[in-house]
Amino acid sequence: MDMAQYQPGQRWISDSEAELGLGTILAQDGRLLTVLYPATGDTRQYALRNAPLTRVRFAPGDEVTHFEGWKMTVREVEESEGLLVYHGLTAQNEQCTLPETQLSNFIQFRLASDRLFAGQIDPLPWFSLRYHTLERRSQLLQSSLWGLGGARAQPIAHQLHIAREVADRMAPRVLLADEVGLGKTIEAGLIIHRQLLSGRAGRVLILVPENLQHQWLVEMRRRFNLQVALFDKERFAESDASNPFEDTQLALVALEWLKEDERAQDALFAAGWDLLVVDEAHHLVWHQDQVSAEYALVEQLAEIIPGVLLLTATPEQLGQDSHFARLRLLDPNRFHDLEAFRRESEQYRPVAEAVQELLDHGSLSAGARKAIHGFLGSEGDELLASVEGGDEEARSRLVRELLDRHGTGRVLFRNTRAAVQGFPQRELHAYPLPMPSQYEELPAGEHPDLYPEVNFQQQWEDGDDNNRWWRFDPRVEWLIDTLKMLKQFKVLVICAHAETALDLEDALRLRSGISATVFHEGMSILERDRAAAYFADEEFGAQVLICSEIGSEGRNFQFAHHLVLFDLPAHPDLLEQRIGRLDRIGQRHTIQLHVPHLENSAQQRLFQWYHQALNAFLNTCPTGNALQHEFGPRLLPLLDGGEDKAWDALLAEGRARREALEAELHSGRDRLLELNSGGAGEGEALVEAIEEQDDDFALPIYMERLFDAYGIHSEDHSENALILKPSEKMLDAGFPLGDDEGVTITYDRAQALAREDMQFLTWEHPMVQGGMDLVLSGSMGNTSVALIKNKALKPGTVLLELLFVSEAVAPRALQLGRWLPPQALRCLLDANGNDLAGRVSLETLNDQLESVPRVSANKFVQAQRDVLAKQFDVAEGKIVPRHEERVARAKQQFAAAMDEELARLTALKAVNPSVRDSELDSLRTQREEGLALLDKASLRLEAIRILVAG
């Protein structure tokens, strides 16, 4: 096409994305062509010289459709200033004119028949690959696991329940407040991933404290294959774009930088986001008479971004005022009065007790009956009567109804270790060691005893190895001896500083020959991946991984259960973060904590504080942050000295205060909230479904077909792992292999969790989805001719196999794929026009087929062209009733689902103000638009296979 012939208003179709419907040329600007696809609302820009577009030009005899729905048969085509005008007759035989600008956006084309008659006949395996790709894509879009089963994480019930519950809402606004170690970041990642896959969100902004940026980057990339753009002062300043944020689907920004840079704030406000995620939201300070700059900034963003996820510490840790401040960000109209919020919270206590009695399966107390009646009225009385009659389904429904009406149950999710099973025990091993004379001679400074080696690292940076600190520090000798005793186990060593980690690696290598690898913030993500993989390798890997404080963020090593704390961090939250590298749900062994410390030093006193006052080694310490604030000013001076009597008194006071706070937390536990957050059994069903999907061989079988078709060479790497490399016959350089040199993959979840250097292939992985997109967006496989060897068929008999796709073209956010996913409808015509597809499967046919040389195949097609064209129409006549039946069923199911959810939320709003009006309005709009687009669902000829008996 001559570039000058592109004109605004012309209609073109994408060769690679036919599902977008008819495109309209918007503009030709320099070397770029802009095309709008009104059916889906998408806009694409193409390089002018090689735009993958085909001009839509109907011929006399073709039937065309106006965007209002009426049809006409073309009699004449006129061209005026580059635009086509069609003249013809309506169904009522009335003359009419239809400019191409007014064509329906939903028209589809028989590209398969065009290619067949043009002699473009594909290799035999491609037809099957296209069919299986269509079938699998259809199943995936309907799957309840879509967006939940592909994460590199152990499937955990409460996480999956929260992710599905939140991600399936339009513009969710919720608070994730699980206790430490329960995986809030994974929950957020699952929600982001599912929202992106479903189309409910297109652009996501993640705000985090600066020290957590790397953790988020690693978690999103490693666990969810989400490519997040990390923005900081330098990247923002270096960008040539008028708004650097606008070209980014997923942006990660540090709150500390953002609050200081007004230009960045303005750009962020103008960029247009669908979902805002804020980590460590409890650090946003709010009081009734004053708010912090960080809180005000997040508040502004929350006002203009439809969806908001706040990740925060548990409400009990924060206190009710601070907790109210987070809820106020989510819905300022609902949470506007702190005192009213306090009163409302008290009302739910008797309901929680009633739910607990229901779950205990005992007889209900009078108080429980009263609470249920007060909360649910006559509906509750009916369910209660059924429960007493032994109806277990009624019991489950009654629990669900009570949970649904819980005041903050729709906006707040909080799981506790007490409510979630599966955590390991911890054992503590303390090793007091003598203070070396070299450290005793150090000048007084800011707690030099905590990290005394730092002074020697600075002093002897380029000095004699014999004088290095690790030659005389008794902790190093102890470490070598301990590692030798534990030589059959993997051991994780964590210390505060990167320099210390590097020194320890030197010490182990030079003094003992123990194989160790390091992990610190100065390494690239790729270098850390390699170090983690070397540590994880059971056969040839390192026994020891030495991590710095920051370097270990975001990494979990559950395959190890021995943790050496070479020194102690100055904050209890950091201590919990260290232990959390091993102490996760799914850890199969008791965590062995090894803590060396120097006697009569700050190290020893900090150990005593954490152990005796906070009990932070043997249990998680939800009160640690509060106790640090309360006791910090008195604790720090006593670490370096002070009388033993004063120290013992502080330990006793700290222990008493911790026990009092823990008692308050326990009595204040919101059991109703815990039950709602845990999912009351729904999460367990999702876990079972994911495990069943993991055990299915469908994905490896499909991927082998895909690799063969595209010329990707696969070879064994080790058990459950393959190496993929592009071969000399690689068909498409655009295949999403991820690395031109090759990649190592595994389909095994356990292997993927232990080996982060391997790609974990699931149906959601970009390589799998990208490969499927390549198949369906291209034309390969939509024409094929084969010889069928079957004694029951007379030689020369022709069978015609056609694949039609029944689909609704719609914006992804409407989720119509759940009710009417694109589905291949197969027709197998014999010479008499009978459809044999119901009796003869595609796989049965495949076993009887042989390839035909392309030249011979083309000669046959051209000779039979007129006969084949008529049979296409016969086949379409057979398929249309099936398509119409699918559409009718989809409309019925879609309307029923929407009506049920509208009724539920409307009833809920009467008793639970946390249901927003915007949610109801959005659902009503979604219902109307969805039904209208289902009415326009189309049928297109996707692929043709001609079978000649021989």
From Swiss-Prot:
Principal EC category: hydrolase
InterPro entries: Helicase_ATP-bd, Helicase_C-like, Helicase_RapA, P-loop_NTPase, RapA_C, SNF2-like_sf, SNF2/RAD54-like_C, SNF2_N
Ranges where the Helicase ATP-binding domain occurs: 165-333
SMART domains given in the database record: DEXDc, HELICc
One BP annotation, GO: regulation of DNA-templated transcription
Segments carrying motif DEAH box: 279-282
Entry keyword 4Fe-4S: no
Keyword Hydrolase: yes
Listed GO MF terms: ATP binding; DNA binding; helicase activity; hydrolase activity, acting on acid anhydrides
Residues annotated as signal peptide: none
Binding site for ATP: D178, E179, V180, G181, L182, G183, K184, T185
Residue ranges constituting the Helicase C-terminal domain according to the UniProt record: 475-629
Keyword terms of this UniProt record: Activator, ATP-binding, DNA-binding, Helicase, Hydrolase, Nucleotide-binding, Transcription, Transcription regulation
EC number: 3.6.4.-
NCBIfam families: PRK04914.1
Function field: Transcription regulator that activates transcription by stimulating RNA polymerase (RNAP) recycling in case of stress conditions such as supercoiled DNA or high salt concentrations. Probably acts by releasing the RNAP, when it is trapped or immobilized on tightly supercoiled DNA. Does not activate transcription on linear DNA. Probably not involved in DNA repair.
Family as reported in the entry's similarity comment: Belongs to the SNF2/RAD54 helicase family. RapA subfamily.
Protein name: RNA polymerase-associated protein RapA
Naturally occurring in which organism (per UniProt): Pseudomonas aeruginosa (strain LESB58)
Lineage: Bacteria, Pseudomonadati, Pseudomonadota, Gammaproteobacteria, Pseudomonadales
Gene that encodes it: rapA
